[in-house]
A protein has these predicted regions:
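A generic structural micro-feature
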Residues: 13, 94-96, 116-120
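Non-heme Fe(II)/2-oxoglutarate
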Residues: 2-92, 112
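A short coil-to-beta-strand element that immediately follows conserved catalytic motifs
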Residues: 90-102
Length: 133
């Protein structure tokens, strides 16, 4: 990943701390392109169907190959490590293995995602396409 300053804030409005950052546009564009390529191909959509793993049974939920997006795994690792260092002062990044699963969820007006639990220590969300209000 290019030596670029990553800006973020950490909030603790209740219980767990929350990291808020802006995903660089290059990654937003790459995630959207990969998602669109898969969703526009019926065979790829079936291969990448991820709906059986998710809380809400939306029409289109697909797994993403985030390793194919140059720099994205490093970006995710960097913000994950920075978050963890801030909320757990005893954290030693050199003793930690980081693994990610990435998927997209297509939602439309009126859809919702019910309360659910993730089986990992950290989870995150990126809003890639937001319709105008």
């Amino acid at each position: 990943m290019a030596e670029e300053q990553i800006s973020f804030d950490i909030y603790q409005p209740f219980g767990p701390s929350v990291l808020k950052t802006k995903l660089p546009q290059i990654y937003v564009d790459a995630l959207n392109k990969q998602s669109d390529d898969i969703l526009n191909d019926e065979e790829k959509s079936k291969e990448r169907d991820w709906s059986h793993n998710l809380a809400e049974k939306e029409k289109k939920e697909i797994s993403i190959d985030h390793m194919a997006i140059n720099g994205l795994p490093e970006f995710l690792a960097t913000i994950s490590k920075e978050y963890t260092k801030r909320v757990l002062p005893e954290y030693l990044p050199e003793n930690t293995k980081i693994a990610f699963r990435v998927w997209t969820v297509s939602q439309w007006a009126g859809d919702f995602n019910p309360m659910h639990i993730h089986d990992s220590n950290l989870s995150g969300v990126c809003f890639l396409k937001i319709p105008p209000e």
